[in-house]
C-alpha cells in the first residue's frame, strides 16, 4: 500500500496575529501557539517546506492607530514591530518543539533577527528549516496579506494558505445567514466580482497575476493544515 504524498512541496502559511490570542483579548496565548506549532510540525514531517508570514493584530494594528489621529506610516511601522514580536514567539516555540526556525525581518533589527535575504531564505527552506517572515513588506500602507503574497511569489511557494477563524469562503456570512454554503473552490475573477473580501485588493491582485493559488481554511480546526497540504477537501481554493 502506497503512502499518500502531500499535494504541495513548498507552502506559504499566513497567520493572523489575532489567531495567536486564542480566547484572550490581547497578546499571545501559550496553549494556542503551542497547538499551532504542533500542526506545523506535523506538516514538516511530511517533507513539506514551510514559510510563515505572521500579522501583528494581537498587539497593534496600524490601521487602528491611523484611525485615532496617529500618522498612518508611523502606526504601520509600529504594526511591523508587533509582527516581529509574534515571529520571535513563534520561532521560540518551534525551536522548543524540535523544529529549526529562522526569523527574517523586512526591517533591519540585526541584534534581534536576521534581515530578509531571498537566497538565504531559499537555502533555509531547502535545508528543512521553517522560515518566519516578520515586519510585513517593510513598507507602510501594505498589509501582512500583501507580504504573504509577495513572499509566496518570491520563494516559489505552490500555494498561499490563509489561516482564518472560518473554515473557508462562503456565499454569505455563515454567522448571519444559515443558508450560506462553503465554496470548495472559486476563481480569482469570480471572487473579485462577488467582492468576497478574502484578502485586500493588493494582495489578491498579486496572487492572481502570479497565478499563485490561495487556500482559505480554519486554523482552529484540529488537523486542518495537514488535510489542506494533503490536497483533501478542506477550506476553499481560490485559483487563477
From Swiss-Prot:
ATP binds at residues 14-17, 57, 61, 164, 170, 173. GO terms for cellular component: cytosol. UMP binds at residues 56, 76, 137-144. Keywords: ATP-binding, Cytoplasm, Kinase, Nucleotide-binding, Pyrimidine biosynthesis, Transferase. GO terms for molecular function: ATP binding; UMP kinase activity. InterPro entries: AceGlu_kinase-like_sf, Asp/Glu/Uridylate_kinase, Uridylate_kinase, Uridylate_kinase_bac. Pathway: Pyrimidine metabolism; CTP biosynthesis via de novo pathway; UDP from UMP (UMPK route): step 1/1. One of its GO terms (biological process) is 'de novo' CTP biosynthetic process. It is found in: Cytoplasm. Its EC number is 2.7.4.22. Its main location: cytoplasm. It holds the Pfam family AA_kinase. It catalyses: UMP + ATP = UDP + ADP. Inhibited by UTP. Homohexamer. Catalyzes the reversible phosphorylation of UMP to UDP. Belongs to the UMP kinase family. NCBIfam families: pyrH_bact (TIGR02075). This is Uridylate kinase. The gene is pyrH.
Amino acid at each position: 500500500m502506497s503512502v499518500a504524498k502531500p499535494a504541495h512541496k513548498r507552502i506559504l502559511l499566513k497567520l493572523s496575529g489575532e489567531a495567536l490570542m486564542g480566547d484572550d483579548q490581547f497578546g499571545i496565548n501559550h496553549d494556542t501557539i503551542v497547538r499551532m506549532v504542533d500542526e506545523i510540525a506535523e506538516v514538516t514531517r511530511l517533507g513539506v517546506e514551510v514559510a510563515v508570514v505572521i500579522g501583528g493584530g494581537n498587539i497593534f494594528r496600524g490601521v487602528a492607530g491611523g484611525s485615532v489621529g496617529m500618522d498612518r506610516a508611523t502606526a504601520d511601522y509600529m504594526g511591523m514591530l508587533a509582527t516581529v514580536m509574534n515571529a520571535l514567539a513563534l520561532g521560540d516555540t518551534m525551536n522548543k518543539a524540535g523544529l529549526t526556525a529562522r526569523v527574517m525581518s523586512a526591517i533591519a533589527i540585526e541584534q534581534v533577527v536576521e534581515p530578509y535575504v531571498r537566497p538565504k531564505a531559499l537555502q533555509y527552506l531547502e535545508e528543512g528549516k521553517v522560515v518566519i517572515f516578520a515586519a510585513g513588506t517593510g513598507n507602510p500602507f501594505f498589509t501582512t496579506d500583501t507580504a504573504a503574497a509577495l513572499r509566496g511569489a518570491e520563494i516559489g511557494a505552490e500555494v498561499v494558505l490563509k489561516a482564518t477563524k472560518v473554515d473557508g469562503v462562503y456565499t454569505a456570512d455563515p454567522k448571519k445567514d444559515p443558508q450560506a454554503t462553503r465554496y470548495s473552490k472559486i476563481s480569482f475573477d469570480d471572487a473579485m466580482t462577488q467582492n468576497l473580501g478574502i484578502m485586500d485588493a493588493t494582495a489578491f491582485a498579486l496572487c492572481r497575476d502570479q497565478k499563485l493559488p490561495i487556500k482559505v481554511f480554519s486554523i482552529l480546526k484540529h488537523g486542518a493544515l495537514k488535510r489542506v497540504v494533503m490536497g483533501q477537501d478542506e477550506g476553499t481554493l481560490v485559483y487563477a
